[in-house]
Every structure is written in C-alpha cells, then in structure tokens.
Regions:
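Glycan-association/targeting regions that enable binding to alpha-glucans and other polysaccharides
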Residues: 1-224
C-alpha cells in the first residue's frame, strides 16, 4: 500500500440535549509505520471561508503489515479534505489522486446521525455486535461500483473448524453521490444467528462486476 491512505470519513449531526443538533465528523487513516516520530493529519476546506486548516490525528492502534490506524474527530465537517503524513523528513499525501475527497455538508447538517460518508477501500466493516438473542449484526460500507452486488460475511464459532456465510441487505446510500473521481458509499446490514453467549470471528466479502473484495481486518479477522 501507499505510505498513507484514507480508510473512511463520515459526518452528520447528533442531538445536543437542548433541542438542537451538534455537527460531527470523523476521519480514519492507515499509515506505514516508517518511524516512531510522525505527524498524521487532515487538511480540511471550510466552505464558508474558503480556507484550508490542518487537524492532527491521534494514534489508535497497530495492525499487521507494520501499519498503524490514526483517527480524529472534528465538529463542523469540511466540504473537501486531504490526508497528510510527515515522517523522516518526507511528506506523503492521500488527496484522492489530486481531486480531493468530498463530504456533503448539507446532508451532514440535515441528518440525525451519519449523513455523508467517503470510503477508500471497496468494502469496510464499521460496526458489529451480538445482541441478546444471539444474533450477530454487522454493518458494512461498500463503494457503489455497480448496481448488482452481493455483500456477505463468512463466520465461525469454533476457530474455523467449520464456517458459514450470511448475506446482507441494502440499507441506504450516503451522500455525496458517485462522481467520476469518487464513488458513492452504501450501507449494507448483515445478520446471522450464532447463538446466545457464542464468540467467534468473521470477515466480510463484496462481490461486484465479477470481482470479490475482502475486508478481513488486515488479516486478523473481526472478533465477536
């Protein structure tokens, strides 16, 4: 992979508790761990003032492949942004091949919850839990590469001695809509009955236009 890459960005609004809503935006980035001392951040464009500002990210965790996940949360989301990584006297960028990444500010302000999403991988698990009835529920984001697609998980509760597939259903599309330089993101929801008190692992796969893409959490699989 490149020295730095966006994983995902999201923005929306949440209730303030006083009858109004507060804006939020979250950014998740993966970098090659080229040295201990490094600076990772988001350059965001303010649609109101037309200015660009730098927002540093914080280290989140290490993952296989000598990679690290960094993230940051802001209030008002930028309408455009790039990712910068400074290390060993070098500066690396992920600026969407020079076109910048875009978020839909109107959709963010008008949505209770997440209203606008950008993802860089073709498929990415974002939330999962086992509910009280023993159902594994997984939320997955995919790039809308083509209309016909299949989103699913493969899971096990016995350390891969046996495994099963569970297929997802389309839930919603996020703004901004697809453009020549940034495909739109869709949310798919997957449910599987694993049993009350069960633990295990899963990975996500996305089949579209004759190709299958995987998210296996950098080779670790996801645990539940």
């Amino acid at each position: 992979m490149n020295a730095v890459a966006l994983l995902r960005a999201e923005a929306g609004s949440s209730p303030s508790g006083t009858g109004s809503f507060n804006p939020f935006s979250n950014f998740f980035v993966v970098v090659q761990n080229l040295a201990f001392t490094k600076l990772v951040g988001i350059w965001g464009h303010d649609a109101g003032t037309g200015t660009w500002s730098f927002h540093p990210c914080s280290y989140s965790r290490s993952v296989p492949g000598n990679l690290e996940i960094w993230e940051t949360g802001l209030g008002l989301p930028p309408d455009q942004f790039d990712v910068e990584y400074q290390v060993l006297g070098n500066i690396f960028w992920d600026n969407n091949a020079g076109y910048n990444y875009s978020l839909d500010i109107g959709a963010a302000e008008g949505t209770d919850g997440v209203g606008t999403v950008v993802i860089n991988p073709n498929v990415l698990a974002v939330e999962w839990e086992v509910d009280g009835a023993g159902n594994l529920n997984v939320d997955v984001l995919v790039k809308n590469i083509a209309f016909v697609k299949q989103v699913a998980i493969v899971y096990t509760t016995n350390n891969w001695l046996t495994f099963q597939n569970a297929f997802g259903n389309y839930s919603q599309s996020f703004a901004p809509s697809s453009s020549p330089h940034q495909l739109g993101a869709e949310l798919w929801k997957i449910g599987a009955s694993v049993g009350i008190g069960k633990t295990g692992q899963f990975a996500v796969f996305y089949t579209v236009a004759g190709t299958t893409y995987w998210d296996n959490n950098f080779g670790l699989n996801y645990s539940f």
